[in-house]
Amino acid sequence: MAQAESSTEVVLVDIEGTTTSISFVHDVLFPYAKENAKDYLLETWQTDETKLIVKELQQLPHYTEYAANLATQPTLDAEAISRFVRYLIERDLKVTPLKTLQGLIWAKGYADGQLRGHVYEDVAGAFGKWHQDGIRIAVYSSGSVAAQKLIFQHSIAGDLLPHLSAHFDTHIGHKQQSESYTKIAESLQVQPQHVLFLTDVPQEAAAARAAGMLTTLLERPGNAPLSEEERKKFSSVADFTGIVV
């Protein structure tokens, strides 16, 4: 059992592999965005929001590489852009305009009842207890803030957003850089040593620890196994029931 110091004021959680299964993100969300990109672009092609996303997609260096490998110059229409979107998703390229578009597609899917956010069965109870005990819960994920909120608002355990006080994505910095965690602590107006960061990625835990935060690794089913060295370096738990704050 991981014993956090009693002075913990904020629990900062990762999503993928921590609150939510990696398979949900890779086997449900990503394919859903890939399969529905064309229809969404066709439906919203004339909106300012979509026009901006398309412009930003075309400005990516990946677009130049993609276009150079085509037999003919790509056209500027929903079908052509959706093919580029599939290209990005298949290569797991985490670029901002793609994340924005994915978030919008997912928002429609959640609103239509076609998607529900996965959370492990211990998450809702832990969130409720920490919130009741006056401990703030914040989220830090590579997924956009909008996408984070959708997972928790439309989760299989109900709407968990009321438990969450702040959301951070890569706009604040890379998850494996200690400066990002320093900025998060500053944004939360809390000293880093009063923040417990929960993640499944040792490199992220190392960055958070370098910033002065407490850290615990999650060993969820489907997560990459920890090495013996990582087990010695960090505390780890199987689920949130093993965390005491």
Swiss-Prot record:
* Presence of keyword Lipid biosynthesis: no
Q: Which GO terms describe its cellular component?
A: cytoplasm; nucleus
* Any one biological process term the GO annotation gives: L-methionine salvage from methylthioadenosine
Main EC class of this protein?
hydrolase
Enumerate the InterPro entries for this protein: Enolase-ppase_E1, ENOPH1_eukaryotes, HAD-like_sf, HAD-SF_hydro_IA, HAD_sf
Q: Provide the primary localization.
A: cytoplasm
Q: Which residues cross the membrane?
A: none
Q: Which cofactor does it need?
A: Mg(2+)
Q: Name one Pfam family in it.
A: Hydrolase
Cofactor: binding comment: Binds 1 Mg(2+) ion per subunit.
Protein's cellular compartments = Cytoplasm; Nucleus
Q: Which domain of life is it from?
A: Eukaryota
Describe, as the record does, how this protein assembles with itself and its partners: Monomer.
Similarity-based family: Belongs to the HAD-like hydrolase superfamily. MasA/MtnC family.
| Cited NCBIfam families | enolase-ppase (TIGR01691), HAD-SF-IA-v1 (TIGR01549)
Protein name in UniProt:
Enolase-phosphatase E1
The species this protein belongs to is Drosophila grimshawi (Hawaiian fruit fly)
